[in-house]
Regions:
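Glycoside hydrolase catalytic-domain context in secreted enzymes
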Residues: 1-252
């Protein structure tokens, strides 16, 4: 693409790679040769925004040194559902603490709160509009975890951490696979459509209310159909042959 008229460069992105969890199929890559820090949940336990910003700045330098210019992080989701398997990537359940640490994280990676600069690593805050309250703790990478609920009418509570991202002029926002179940916001019912396709969430709320004018980046495989293998799982022959379950398309 760099050779065409528009001169658009290829952008290399990555999930977090400065922590302990190694799950390259989904959420995080072990630090390896990169500096190793506590998971973001551990950083939240420390509760020091200056430290989180320092972490982001160090990780920024490491990313750029190897040609990575986009971070598929931070997670602004709140850990209000302890059964959900991704709470280690959050900043906990306190929405105000999460807001301050999300802001600091982005300022470290993007070098301040003035948006993208020549030495920035673009951050992608996720998963709008708050993926923490997965129904029964089941994850929306799978068709059986597609519902997202906000018990006690706490939808607005889950939006607060994203305010920190917008204050830091985050470069991109990623919605999740899930669909909102029985959700109302400011007296209006939200259509039960996946967040990545939901006009009320992306156009009215994100673009309209929050005035976000950056990139909306869909989560991976968002248009894949959920085929028979996706719904029923691998056959015994496939399991015996060592077929990875991550070859199964993500279900919507």
């Amino acid at each position: 693409l760099e050779g065409v008229g528009l001169g658009i460069p290829m952008t290399v992105s990555t999930d977090p790679r400065n922590h302990f969890t190694h799950d390259p199929n989904a959420t995080s890559i072990g630090a390896g040769a990169f500096s190793q820090w506590p998971e973001t949940l551990g950083l939240a336990a420390i509760g020091d925004a200056a430290l989180v910003q320092r972490f982001g700045d160090i990780a920024r330098q490491e990313y750029r040194a190897v040609g990575i210019h986009e971070a598929l992080s931070p997670q602004a989701d709140l850990a209000t559902e302890p059964r959900w398997g991704r709470i280690n990537g959050t900043f906990g359940e306190d929405n105000l603490l999460a807001k301050s640490l999300v802001k600091a994280y982005i300022e470290g990676f993007q070098q301040g709160s003035d948006g993208i600069g020549p030495e920035s690593v673009v951050t992608v805050v996720k998963h709008f509009a708050g993926a923490g309250p997965q129904k029964n703790g089941l994850d929306a990478h799978n068709p059986w975890g597609k519902e997202q609920v906000y018990p006690g009418g706490q939808f607005a509570y889950h939006l607060v951490p994203f305010e920190g991202a917008f204050e830091a002029k985050v470069g991109a926002v990623m919605p999740y696979y899930a669909l909102p179940e029985g959700l109302t916001h400011e007296g209006q019912a939200i259509e039960e459509v996946g967040f990545g396709f939901n006009r009320q969430i992306l156009t009215d709320l994100l673009r309209g209310h929050f005035k976000f004018d950056g990139v909306v980046l869909s989560d991976w495989g968002i248009v894949n159909d959920c085929n028979a293998r996706c719904e029923q799982g691998l056959s015994q022959d496939e399991v015996t042959a060592g077929v990875s379950p991550w070859t199964v398309p993500f279900g919507m």
